[in-house]
């Protein structure tokens, strides 16, 4: 999982990326390509 300051650019890298808020943190998740997983921090 990558840790990034800004997730907006990461979200656009694949069409299945989703921006999700969990427990006060923002994540990018992708069910089909797991390598696009990232957390904002």
Swiss-Prot record:
Keywords: Ribonucleoprotein, Ribosomal protein. GO terms for molecular function: structural constituent of ribosome. It holds the Pfam family Ribosomal_L36. GO terms for cellular component: ribonucleoprotein complex; ribosome. One of its GO terms (biological process) is translation. It comes from the Bacteria. PROSITE patterns: RIBOSOMAL_L36 (PS00828). Belongs to the bacterial ribosomal protein bL36 family. PANTHER family: 50S RIBOSOMAL PROTEIN L36 2, LARGE RIBOSOMAL SUBUNIT PROTEIN BL36B. This is Large ribosomal subunit protein bL36.
């Amino acid at each position: 999982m990558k840790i990034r300051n800004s997730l907006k650019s990461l979200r656009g890298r694949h069409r299945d990326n989703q921006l999700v808020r969990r427990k006060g943190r923002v994540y990018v998740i992708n069910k089909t390509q797991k390598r696009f997983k990232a957390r904002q921090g």
